[in-house]
């Protein structure tokens, strides 16, 4: 039987009243569960309490948009190169072996696989790294899938503003493969800490300059149409006290850890203990890559993800060491 349009509407109303059909609301596009891109920003020498004393609207915004803790721990010794090696390898210092803190080319490269290698092998991810200190080159192995940019702190123009601008410019000009994993080191706060003292006015001013630079970076990702598909992780290699660091003092060991992006809880305060070492596995989790095998101590910070209930830990984290 053919039902004409007016009769069709009346029939629908009758069926609705009888509870035999339901109105279907338009389905909104589901938010992505995983990130297409991950940006890890290591703010050299950033103490958590500096975020309360300095004006940091960009980092405050990431904290509100994502998950964070101000009680994360770096590794011992609390020095830049060993800490960066731990963040990138997912291993403590005594296992990755990079226990020095100066650029010494004859020592060669870290022997353990790093996050760039793991992401490239398991997810075909291209990478980009932007360094403010040459000594971190001990952790970065040259690869055709990796864009490397070093802007030395010995050059006056090499500040956070320039480096974050380089990140956006490099993405725009990349031709062979667009980076998906970015690691950015910003040393402004550390330089001010060594020169004028941690928590001094110049140090807090440097923290504010870094915050503005990160804001420029976020805007660049928005302009490129990448922001909503990108997870941003901001942390530090160490804190500092007086004009130094490297001890087991809480001022040196405590660091912030912030993550915001697809599939990450908003306004969430992380409850579990967090180590800088856990950054590597959390990056892989943010990409949605869980089937990989690497012998590391890094564990994803599972509670920050909206699908954390019943989630499976990376297979590599469950296998015993050989």
Name what the model sees in each region.
Residues 134-148, 171-212, 216:
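Active-site His/acidic residue clusters
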Residues 84, 88, 248-291, 302-308:
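Substrate-binding rim/cap in mid-to-C-terminal beta-strand-loop elements of soluble/periplasmic
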Residues 70-88, 130-137, 297:
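Short, solvent-exposed turn/loop segments enriched in Gly/Ser/Thr/Pro and often Arg
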């Amino acid at each position: 039987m053919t039902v004409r349009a007016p009769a069709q509407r009346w029939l629908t109303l009758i069926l609705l009243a009888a509870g035999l059909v339901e109105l279907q609301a338009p389905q909104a596009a589901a938010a992505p569960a995983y990130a297409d891109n991950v940006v890890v920003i290591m703010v050299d020498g950033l103490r958590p309490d500096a975020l309360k004393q300095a004006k940091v609207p960009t980092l405050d915004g990431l904290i509100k948009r994502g998950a964070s803790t101000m009680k994360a721990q770096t590794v011992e010794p609390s020095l830049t190169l060993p800490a960066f090696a731990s963040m990138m390898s997912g291993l403590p210092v005594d296992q990755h072996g990079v226990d020095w803190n100066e650029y010494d080319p004859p020592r060669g490269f870290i022997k353990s696989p790093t996050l760039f290698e793991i992401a490239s092998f398991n997810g075909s991810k291209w990478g980009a790294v932007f360094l403010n200190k040459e000594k971190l080159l001990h952790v970065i192995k040259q690869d055709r899938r990796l864009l490397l940019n070093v802007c030395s702190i010995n050059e006056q123009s090499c500040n956070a503003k320039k480096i974050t601008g380089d990140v956006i410019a490099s993405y725009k000009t990349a031709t062979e493969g667009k980076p998906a994993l970015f690691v950015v080191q910003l040393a402004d706060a550390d330089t001010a800490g060594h020169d004028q003292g941690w928590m001094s006015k110049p140090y807090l001013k440097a923290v504010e300059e870094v915050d503005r630079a990160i804001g420029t970076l976020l805007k660049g990702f928005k302009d490129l149409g990448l922001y909503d598909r990108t997870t941003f992780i901001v942390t530090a290699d160490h804190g500092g006290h007086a004009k130094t660091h490297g001890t087991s003092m809480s001022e040196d060991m405590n660091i912030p850890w912030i993550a915001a992006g697809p599939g990450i809880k908003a306004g969430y305060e992380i409850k579990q203990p967090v180590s800088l070492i856990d950054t590597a596995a959390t990056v892989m989790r943010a990409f949605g890559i869980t089937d990989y095998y690497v012998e590391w101590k890094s564990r994803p910070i599972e509670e920050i993800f909206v699908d954390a209930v019943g989630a499976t830990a990376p297979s590599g984290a469950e296998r015993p060491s050989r």
